[in-house]
Amino acid sequence: MKIKEETKGLGDIIYSEWLLPIIHYYATLRKNEFIFEVALPIIIAIISTRIYAVLNRVESALQGLANILPSAISILIGFTAMLITILLTSNGENVEKLKKIKTEKKIFDKNISLYQNLHIQLSHSLFAEIILLLIIFFQQFMYGIVKCDWINNCMLIIEIFLILNILLSILRGITNIYFSFYNQENR
């Protein structure tokens, strides 16, 4: 008797469970959050890349980012990992409050708590930071091998998008934490 029907898919070939927090993140975004964290960074990335392309400066922009981003993103990775660790290992009145505050956001048709929402958001930021660092390393590796304008343009769009997405996501997370503890009486 088979309990689970055997299926062949990408998950059988390569580990893909790491995509679930990213899927959960995008599934929980409200329209205004999507515009703030996804659409706006895409628009800015495309416009910025177009300006650099017109000025024939895409390669210098990529090199400039490659010079500063690995260190900055590594620090952000450490900071985000620390925030996740603190969130997951802390207990007390404030954490219990976060766990009790339900949001209108749903995963698997169940409302998630603000605690779960923050965990999803921080996990997404961590994954995006790691992906950005890998993309920068890949771009630097390929720089000496392949010189192609449209690849450079795509890389610049992706890097600008991820930088803005990460920073705006962190900003929204900080805002969520702030307002979850903001006392209504202090207004």
Feature map (PLM): residue ranges:
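Long, highly hydrophobic alpha-helical transmembrane signal-anchor segments
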Residues: 31-74, 155
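Juxtamembrane "helix exit" motif at the C-terminal ends of alpha-helical transmembrane segments
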Residues: 44-60, 90, 134-146
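Hydrophobic alpha-helical transmembrane segments
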Residues: 9-25, 66-77, 100-114
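Membrane-helix interface/capping segments
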Residues: 59, 85-106
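Hydrophobic alpha-helical membrane-embedded segments
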Residues: 71-92
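Alpha-helical transmembrane segments of integral membrane proteins
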Residues: 32-33, 37-41, 100-187
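N-terminal juxtamembrane cytosolic/stromal segments of multi-pass membrane proteins
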Residues: 1-40, 44-46
